[in-house]
UniProtKB/Swiss-Prot annotation:
The keyword rRNA processing does not apply. The modification Phosphoserine is found at S583. The keyword Cytoplasm applies. This is LisH domain-containing protein ARMC9. Involved in ciliogenesis. It is required for appropriate acetylation and polyglutamylation of ciliary microtubules, and regulation of cilium length. Acts as a positive regulator of hedgehog (Hh) signaling. May participate in the trafficking and/or retention of GLI2 and GLI3 proteins at the ciliary tip. Pfam families: ARMC9_ARM, ARMC9_LisH, CTLH_Armc9. Its main location: cytoplasm. Residues 204-230 form a coiled coil. Residues 765-774, 808-817 have a biased composition (Polar residues). Residues 637-659, 761-817 are annotated as: Disordered. It is found in: Cytoplasm, Cytoskeleton, Cilium basal body; Cell projection, Cilium; Cytoplasm, Cytoskeleton, Microtubule organizing center, Centrosome, Centriole. The gene is Armc9. GO terms for cellular component: centriole; ciliary basal body; ciliary tip; cilium; cytoplasm. Residues 7-39 form the LisH domain.
Length: 817
């Protein structure tokens, strides 16, 4: 009761203000009379003086009238008296408008005075404007838009000065008047809001929910920031340690040139600094530093990822009930279910847990891909609800990120047709289109779907989309260019491009100079591929493509320069390369890239948020849709070409951007444990297995780059020296290789052709090793494995397996005599 008495005057004032605002005139009179009878004081300054609509209109009319008549004093008296200072001093729109209003009154006599204007009055207005510029208007002096007008008071005849030509056009004053009227309407409408209504809005249920959501997001952001900070500090410390050790090793190598020996004690001290903590204690007892190869074996063993605890499987679900609610439920329920199903897939641990989730979706035909009913889950892609359409596209994109998911979606062409239709129709929701495009790009890893997309004219749609790349998000740009490149790898795709050769070449040449450097490998790949068609080469020469490319050689980095040089070589070639297949349009499934790329963009910018007490995510699934034994295991399909290729077939493998968008590639689940895959996603991938140089001979293609086996052209066996096969591979992430010129090994006399990755991914995680640039003059000496003398014990060959603790990094060269 004491609190009420302390604030009784303000509370009664709020009620009076609201009754006045709502025009309850009789009620207001009765209320005021009763307050007076009871001796209750009414606060007169609750929310400032209440401006009723009628009074506001009068003020607005007076301001506009003063504007029209050029009455500067009357206008600014009303302006300063009725526009709150908080608005005039802090609102950028109000400040800009006031600046132009001062210009209007300063030049009013010059524009509207018949005959010669009164010099004294004109000087007075110019002086007033000059004073404004030196005081309040000085805040805008650094703005480019207003900078020329600071010279206005000093120009003898502004009407003929080119800088002020716009001010004296007939349209300038009406446009300024319209801006003034809009500003006044918004300002006085805001001032009319009673404080009681403002308090209600600020403390309503929506505000509480919003505050709760913001608080939750803040907590999560702080938690992630701390995690990333710890990772960063560890990576930085490891980097500094590595640089220090490298510097010492360089000094030691220089010393050995002059004949100085390296002692075992020094080698031991270096290895101790490189080994992980768990091995340092036993290092002195387990490593014989006098025997070559022992230390390197122990070092590689120390870098092997630790085994983590087994991850439990997620509970089974009632998929019949799930699909029923996805078809017949409310739009909000559909959106939450689609979100939860996606989260179950994207947040599961790579390996058995994720495979079990995926196989449950497939075996229960979650999306009704095999259903012929009129209403199916797939139809949600064309829902009237924006949230449902977007979340359906996100789920399909997540499924397409996994090899088995792509196989499930590809078994029925209606999924592809629906995605193509949604892609061309979706013009409202950017995220929906991004996810549809991402799914189609991943579909392009499969040859039958490539063929279907080429036949459907998707290349023409992509070319039209990429004509204005600055209007596209980074995701849309990268995935559309990567999709275009994948389709251009096929003969049918190249022939499609030949129909619009001029436009295609113009779009690609424009993309070469785009600020998003992530698209460069795909642009170069597409350009190199289509230039194998003679008609496109002729068109490129006619438009001066070589000069355009040489401009980028001057500005690009070494990798970009190397790629462009080979494109120029292709451009200037007269005949098709030897060894080109007559047709690459067979539909064999062994072109499938059997890899999984679950990029972080799948869960970005969630459109819906649960209200208080509303279930979402895994809690929604396990509370309302718990099932019995619907998680059925199934062995992963392993195509013979998923790991290696025959010597007769050229490397023609499509790629997807997702692998390097997430920072580092994710290892194939069937090749590594779920613990290792999770560490790879977290940026803890320690070593990247590459191929043995002894495994390859001339003309025998294999796997290059970041563990990929992808190429973008037909090639001569003698022109290209591939890097060979790889027993266990990483996810293909846009790694396409270029050969270097032949050099002679000075130590052996053998002719050596190096194969260096030109179209290679750039891992963004410092712990992921990058490809080493090799010197042609020292081809044999640059193997990452240690070199041994003939007298000492030799290191045994180690298979390049991710599961092996004795993995080795060997140079990817092919040597021919």
């Amino acid at each position: 009761m004491g609190d009420i008495l302390a604030h009784e005057s303000e509370l009664l004032g709020l009620v009076k203000e609201y009754l006045d605002f709502a025009e309850f005139e009789d009620t207001l009179k009765t209320f005021s009379k009763e307050c007076k009878v009871k001796g209750k004081p009414l606060c007169k300054n609750v929310g400032g003086p209440l401006k009723k609509d009628s009074k506001s209109l009068v003020i607005q009319r007076d301001l506009v009238a003063a504007f029209d008549s050029g009455d500067q004093k009357a206008f600014f008296d009303l302006w300063e008296g009725h526009i709150p200072s908080s608005v005039r001093d802090t609102d950028s729109l109000a400040q800009k408008l006031e600046f132009y209003l001062h210009i209007h009154f300063a030049i009013y006599l010059l524009k509207y005075c018949r005959g010669r204007p009164d010099k004294q009055e004109l000087d007075k207005r110019i002086s007033y404007f000059k004073t404004y510029l030196e005081t309040k208007g000085a805040a805008l002096s650094q703005t480019t838009e207003f900078l020329p007008f600071y010279a206005l008071p000093f120009v003898p005849n502004p009407m003929v000065h080119p800088s002020f030509k716009e001010l004296f056009q007939d349209s300038w004053t009406p446009e300024l008047k319209l801006k003034l009227e809009k500003f006044l309407a918004l300002t006085f409408k805001a001032n009319n809001t009673p404080k009681l209504l403002t308090i209600y809005k600020e403390n309503g249920p929506n505000s509480k929910e919003l505050l709760q959501q913001l608080h939750q997001q803040l907590v999560e952001a702080e938690r992630r920031a701390m995690t990333y900070l710890k990772r960063y500090n560890k990576i930085q410390a490891d980097y500094h340690n590595l640089i220090g050790v490298t510097a010492e090793l360089v000094d030691s190598l220089e010393a050995t040139v002059s004949g100085k020996m390296i002692t075992p004690e020094y080698l031991q001290s270096v290895c101790v600094r490189l080994f992980s903590n768990q091995m340092r204690q036993s290092l002195a007892h387990s490593v014989d530093f006098t025997r070559p190869g022992t230390a390197s074996t122990m070092l590689r063993a120390s870098l092997a990822p630790e085994k983590l605890k087994d991850v439990p499987l997620l509970p089974s679900l009632d998929y019949e009930k799930l699909k029923k609610d996805l078809i017949w439920g409310s739009d909000r329920l559909k959106a939450f279910l689609l979100q939860a199903l996606r989260w179950r897939l994207t947040t599961s641990h790579p390996g058995e847990q994720r495979e079990t989730v995926l196989q449950a979706y497939i075996s229960n035909d979650l999306l009704d891909c095999h259903s012929h009913n009129q209403r199916s889950v797939l139809q949600l892609l064309h829902s009237k609800s924006e949230a449902v359409r977007q979340y359906m596209a996100r789920l399909i994109n997540a499924l397409a990120s996994l090899a088995e998911g792509r196989l499930y979606l590809a078994q029925n062409t209606k999924v592809l047709r629906m995605l193509e239709g949604r892609l061309k129709e979706e013009d409202k929701d950017v995220i929906t289109r991004e996810n549809v495009l991402g799914a189609l790009q991943k579909f392009s890893l499969r040859r039958p779907l490539q063929t279907a997309m080429i036949r459907d004219g998707l290349i023409f749609w992509l070319i039209d989309l990429l004509k204005d790349p600055d209007c596209l998000s980074d995701y849309t740009l990268e995935y559309s260019v990567a999709l275009l490149m994948n389709l251009c790898l096929r003969s049918a795709g190249k022939n499609m491009c030949a129909k619009v050769a001029g436009l295609m070449l113009k779009v690609l040449s424009d993309l070469l100079g785009h600020e998003n450097h992530e698209i460069q490998p795909y642009v170069n790949g597409a350009l190199y591929s289509i230039l194998s068609i003679p008609s496109i080469r002729e068109e490129a020469r006619a438009m001066g493509m070589e000069d355009i490319l040489r401009c980028f050689i001057k500005e690009g980095n070494a990798e970009m320069i190397r790629q462009i040089e080979f494109i120029i070589k292709q451009l200037n070639s007269e005949d098709l390369l030897d060894g080109v297949l007559e047709s690459d349009d067979d539909e064999d499934e062994d072109d499938e890239e059997d890899h999984d790329i679950m990029e972080a963009d799948l869960d970005k910018d969630e459109l819906i948020q649960p209200q208080l007490g509303e279930l979402s995510g895994e809690k929604l699934l396990t509370t309302e849709y718990l099932g019995i034994m619907t998680n059925t295991g199934k062995a992963r399909r392993k195509g013979p070409a998923s790991v290696q290729w025959s010597g007769d077939e050229p490397l023609r493998r499509p790629v997807t951007p997702g692998g390097h968008r997430t920072g580092c590639p994710v290892l194939g689940d069937h090749l590594i444990s779920p613990q290792n895959a999770q560490q790879a996603r977290n940026g803890c991938l320690r070593a990247m297995p590459v191929a043995h140089p002894d495994d390859y001979k001339e003309g025998k293609p294999g796997v290059t780059g970041c563990g990929t086996s992808s190429s973008f052209m037909d090639h001569k066996p003698r022109e290209w020296s591939p890097a060979g096969h790889q027993k266990s591979r990483l996810v293909p992430t846009a790694a396409l290789g270029w050969p270097r010129e032949m050099t002679q090994d000075p130590s052996s006399g053998h002719i050596t052709r190096e194969f260096v990755p030109a179209f290679t991914c750039k891992p963004q995680v410092p712990s992921t090793p990058e490809t080493v640039e090799q010197n042609p003059l020292k081809a044999k000496a640059l193997s990452l494995a240690p070199q041994f003398s003939s007298s000492g014990p030799q290191q045994a060959s180690r298979p390049a397996s991710t599961a092996s603790s004795t993995r080795g990094l060997h140079s990817s060269q092919s040597i021919r005599k």
